[in-house]
Amino acid sequence: MGRDTIADIITSIRNVDMNRKGTVRIESTNMAEKIVKILLREGFIENVRKHQENKKSFLVLTLRHRRNRKGPSPSRTFLNLNLKRISRPGLRVYSNYQKIPRILGGMGIVILSTSRGIMTDREARLEGIGGEILCYIW
């Protein structure tokens, strides 16, 4: 049975977010790099570094946080990041561009795999193409 790399990425980010850690290391694949590029562009993560160890490449992600200005000493709290895998190897979910769901009225994003590559729901609607719904992020 094959590995679901998208589910691995989502689970790693979710676990680090729940434990209030600052960084997460995920295995570097073409799909992972494209998804991380979208997360960086949309502002869900702060920084990405490529790290090589024993001929294997990893991506080191720094999660976004906001400063808490209340209280005597300013502290940092991480954004509560919610990720949900939709299409999976056992049950693929497809949508045309007119029926792509809006997450929180457009506040969240849907990541799709289309014939023109991995893109967000807004980009897919603008280009008028549908595809496989990979995950929701809000």
UniProtKB/Swiss-Prot annotation:
InterPro entries: Ribosomal_uS8, Ribosomal_uS8_CS, Ribosomal_uS8_sf
PROSITE patterns: RIBOSOMAL_S8
Locations listed in the record: Plastid, Chloroplast
Chief localisation class: plastid
GO molecular function, one term: rRNA binding
Family matches, as Pfam families: Ribosomal_S8
Alphabetic keyword roster: Chloroplast, Plastid, Ribonucleoprotein, Ribosomal protein, RNA-binding, rRNA-binding
Top-level taxon in the UniProt lineage: Eukaryota
GO cellular component, one term: ribonucleoprotein complex
One GO biological process term: translation
Record HAMAP family: Ribosomal_uS8_B
Family membership noted in the UniProt record: Belongs to the universal ribosomal protein uS8 family.
Function description: One of the primary rRNA binding proteins, it binds directly to 16S rRNA central domain where it helps coordinate assembly of the platform of the 30S subunit.
UniProt subunit comment: Part of the 30S ribosomal subunit.
Entry-linked PANTHER family: 40S RIBOSOMAL PROTEIN S15A
Name recorded for this polypeptide: Small ribosomal subunit protein uS8c
Naturally occurring in which organism (per UniProt): Oenothera elata subsp. hookeri (Hooker's evening primrose)
Lineage, broadest ranks: Eukaryota, Viridiplantae, Streptophyta, Embryophyta, Tracheophyta
